[in-house]
């Protein structure tokens, strides 16, 4: 719903509108297992826009536009965050499988701790070394493995492809007495049933209710000023400056700070335009006058890339000259 108005004997136009959209199964893409997968959410988008132009004297013109947009995911929206598969739950840890596997998995912290304890006990004194995840979530060098040991790199495959407890290499058994090596379990290990893992070990759903849609800054502003005047009987010139500003937004639907946050930025442009009655036009311009570098969007890649992120930025400062002829 909107309104369009002409004011001040035609010297000013003032337009405005309000809007409300309700989406079902709004699609947002992310990379999973090297494939683009659509996540579907219900969402609402509402806001208001205003634009105005004013020419107080012949040749001098001002323009302004502003927008407010409120975007929200519906209650009950949820998804697995690939860079935070445990959703901050300390009882679970992210494990990277073999390099040939495309996706990480999650395993209970108790399973990881018991595997590390069993490996150390079974391989005490062995000279062969490798590296595995430590209980603190990083890498620990110097863990000693025998040739038939089960490294943590296999734990995801064992749990979610074979359906066995990685500690025992057998189907779930409550309070198992021994580990894979036949050594007694002394740490009070209760056993792990892979069937009970959240979402088959892919991760824990995050509650996204009320989160903003990606690349939807709540506030945007633009303004410009130009002055046109005759230079001779054949030529006219126009000088113009315009700017654009947008507030903070998010690159992903998870709205994780600071990773997902896209900071607001300002962009200013200048131009000089010369035209004549024969259809020639010459324009000299500067885009992004202050050489502002801002990230305007980001795209998260899959686990096997190390969860690398592609970012999109504003163009650098650009000087240009354009000559055109119209017939």
Predicted region positions:
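Hydrophobic, lipid-facing positions within transmembrane beta-strands of outer-membrane proteins
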Residues: 1, 46-50, 219-223, 266-270, ...
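Transmembrane beta-barrel domains of outer membrane proteins
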Residues: 2-6, 51-53, 65, 226-228, ...
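Outer-membrane beta-barrel strand-turn architecture
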Residues: 7-9, 22, 54-60, 229-233, ...
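Gram-negative outer-membrane beta-barrel transporters
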Residues: 20, 39-253
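C-terminal beta-signal and adjacent terminal beta-strands/loops
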Residues: 71, 243-254, 258, 273-327
